[in-house]
Amino acid sequence: SRDCFPESLSVTRRQNLVNAYKAKYNADEIYECPVCIVESEIHMMQALDDIKKAGCNALCVYLGNFGPEISETMLAQYFDGPKMFVAAAEETSENGGLVQGRGDAYCGMLNASYNLKLRNVKAYIPEYPVGTAEECADMIHEFIPVAKAVYALSNLKIISFGPRPTNFLACNAPIKQLYNLGVEIEENSELDLFEAFNKHAGDERIPEVVKSMEKELGNGNKKPEILPKLAQYELTLLDWVEQHKGSRKFVAIAGKCWPAFQTQFGKSKPAFLLHSTGHLPAGSE
């Protein structure tokens, strides 16, 4: 809120927006920060601390009126996660005129977008970001899948096993662009994988994994003799993920569907291996 407006105007509009969202969508998806930033960096830090304590991993900055462009964009700058901006449309009186001649927050949104650019802050702004409580609730709901994608990428590690095969250019991933997306990469030698695979020989969990594979394959189980090897390989990858995911919450495996040392592994490596466990995606080139 600007300090030339009553703070209660923004607070009431914020409450109406949150109530509109809860009435139409999943109430567990949204948290209402009680701090109203009134042209104050101190308020901004209080709001940042509050949403961190609440465990929020995405942020919507709502301009209840023109909005203080400095502190509101600082909040987006300091928040570590996907963020969006929306703004309040002016309520109208019964005769269609603006209540007490007040304007809406479109002007503040223009200033906010300019300040975000100056700060090199990437934020999602809807095509027309000014609306009623119900309209802004719809905008937030449309942002959720975007926020999930951004959050997932920034917490993802792709574990690959090489060398990358000759004549498969698509396998030679442009790592720089993955880094730009916030994705972490761990490239390993297939010899490392082979060593880990051998260490899982005779693993006591293999029979249980084989049973799971047999159940999924059903009548399609044409080569039951290779299932123990496949189970051994699956456990190798699952343990590798647990030992190597580091600070990341999500992991995907990128490998080749046939190993360079196929005679040593005693099998090829189909991409569906980990699908039966429901643990994580494992894809080939």
What are these regions (language model features)?
Residues S1-S113, K117-Y151, N155-I159, R164-A254:
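Metallocofactor- and cofactor-centric catalytic cores in central/energy metabolism, strongly enriched
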Residues R248-E285:
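Glycine-rich anion/phosphate-binding loop at the beta-strand->alpha-helix junction
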